[in-house]
Design a protein with these regions (language model features):
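Conserved donor-nucleotide/metal-binding helix-loop-beta segment in metal-dependent transferases, i.e.
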Residues: 94-124
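Active-site regions of enzymes building and remodeling cell-envelope glycoconjugates
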Residues: 47-67, 71-72, 98-106
Length: 296
């Protein structure tokens, strides 16, 4: 039995929709029971609609989660059974089966007063709606792939909470479906991840990689091109488009954009050179004595 995947896709890509490209490559490489791929919303220029099902749908005003719910509801008529909802900025890092995918979440405490921040306020409205109906409240909005049942998702679509008030999609669905939260091994990059060596070391253990626009810097973009170099069937077969990671990392010009050296940079460079020259002059024994004095 295969499991379909649904991507609700908007137009807010920070990388010319290459987030979706590498997410699809990770599915093709690691998911053993991958079924149909359904993309609802924006269509990337490189997407091969002969290999995936694309359902056009424009975003409407009213919030990100509301648009995602609308798009997933449109996909429910085309899935073969239980499916997985994914975002374009999520990648699979190890071999797995979607049939065994748990609902990633955590037990959350009741919120008191309505928060002022938008995301927390959306969670508050979701929690209040669930509490009024005697439903449990677990936080499933951990930015992870989410297993879904189309029947329950349609039932959620009939409720007015997501149409009249802003809510969070995974927490609303997970508690209506009675899912048990599962804490898993997930790698998050919601801030610059650091050097390439740290990234390649960090991705060895977790099951999923999740990131946002702040975490998607040039180093992570390069790491994704190295981890998932093979084209997926979902990409267009037109090879006239040059596949050059440098074009994505540095823009249209493949040469790195280097800031001209400033006067303060020159003085720092001269101080480093002088320090290195003095260390070379004193020899190995002198360097050992210098390190010993600094340690003392």
């Amino acid at each position: 039995m295969t499991i379909d995947v649904v991507y609700p896709l908007g137009t807010g890509s920070a990388w010319n929709d290459n987030e979706l490209r590498f997410s699809l490559r990770s599915l093709m490489r690691y998911v053993e029971d991958l079924g149909r791929i359904i993309i609802v919303g924006h269509k990337p220029s490189w997407l091969d609609v002969a290999s995936v099902l694309h359902i056009p749908m424009a975003d409407s005003k009213g919030g990100k989660d509301r648009n995602m719910i609308r798009k997933v509801l449109a996909a429910c008529d085309h899935v073969s059974g239980p499916f997985v909802r994914m975002s374009d900025d999520q990648c699979v890092l190890r071999s797995m089966r979607f049939a065994d995918l748990p609902a990633y979440g955590r037990r959350a405490e009741r919120l008191g007063e309505c928060p002022t921040k938008r995301w927390s306020r959306n969670k508050y409205h979701t929690q209040q709606w669930l509490a009024e109906r005697g439903l449990s409240f677990h936080d499933f909005d951990l930015h992870c792939p989410m297993p879904c049942d189309p029947k329950i998702f349609r039932q959620m679509g009939e409720e007015s909470v997501w149409q009249n008030e802003k809510c969070t999609i995974n927490t609303l669905y997970g508690n209506m479906a009675g899912l048990i939260p599962h804490l898993g091994d997930i790698l998050y990059y919601h801030s610059p991840p650091g050097c390439h060596r740290k990234i390649f070391s960090a991705v060895r253990g977790p099951m999923f990689l999740n990131y946002n626009n702040k975490g998607l810097d040039n180093r992570l973009r390069y790491a994704l091109t190295v981890m998932f170099p093979d084209w997926s069937p979902a990409e267009t077969a037109d090879h006239s488009e040059v596949f050059d990671p440098n074009d994505w990392i540095y823009g249209r010009d493949s040469r790195p954009r280097i800031r001209p050296e400033q006067p303060q940079d020159k003085s720092r460079r001269r101080r480093r050179q002088a320090s290195h020259a003095s260390l070379r002059a004193i020899g190995p024994a002198g360097r050992r004595r210098l390190r010993a004095r600094r340690g003392a």
